[in-house]
């Protein structure tokens, strides 16, 4: 049976083969088309897979963005709460500051008012001080004028002081000269004391000669020559020598011309000393002469004694030749003794 079936099928083989070939070709074509479609589908699938991958990535990024946005939103919410809290604290601080500033403004206003009163008071004080300054300026001007006057006076006083210094030097020099004069006068006084004994004896002889002259005049008889010394010049020689020594010493020790103030003071002292001298006049000498007793120091006493002795010794022996002695000059000072001696000589 089996062989019969195959025998029947053999003539059908080429047709089957052709049909199969055609079928195969069609199948191949279909397969090719299917492969093409498959390749296109695969391509599309790859594209879609890539797109899906991108979409997945985008979704993940979106998810991440959402999470980050959520975190950001939470952070923003937290920041908003914090800012609200900070704003509340800032408002409270601002309110406190406003209160403090208002209090400070009130204090500043009070201080401004106080300063205004102080400024007004100080402006008054400044006005008073300006008035005082004006008065002080006037006083300074007057004081400057007085200072100028005092400066001129001080210049004059300085000039006077210079003159006084020069006068002091002159006075010192004159004091040295006076000490030298005192020494010389002491020497002359010693010499006069030595010659006093001789003068007393000579005075006795002179008295005797005067008595003899008077008796000879009244009796018209010549005086006895035996009582008189043989040479009258020998009697008068020692006092003349002493009197000549005194003016020589005075001329040698005569000081230089002094300043006018010192000369005036010496004249005043001399007038005071001579005013103190009491004048002794006898009853018999009222019309003729009057002796003056000098109450001076040791220098003036020695000079006065020498002058009186020279005057008595130089008198003429005759009573008719007696000279009338006038009063001494009260203004004569120590410097005027040489003039007196010249008159006596």
UniProtKB/Swiss-Prot annotation:
Expression found only in the brain and spinal cord. GO terms for cellular component: extracellular region. InterPro entries: Luzp2. Glycans are attached at residues 133, 301. It comes from the Eukaryota. The keyword Glycoprotein applies. Residues 298-313 have a biased composition (Polar residues). Residues 16-211 form a coiled coil. Its main location: secreted. Residues 1-19 form the signal peptide. Residues 223-345 are annotated as: Disordered. It is found in: Secreted. Residues 261-277 have a biased composition (Basic and acidic residues). This is Leucine zipper protein 2. It comes from Mus musculus (Mouse). The lineage of its organism: Eukaryota, Metazoa, Chordata, Craniata, Vertebrata.
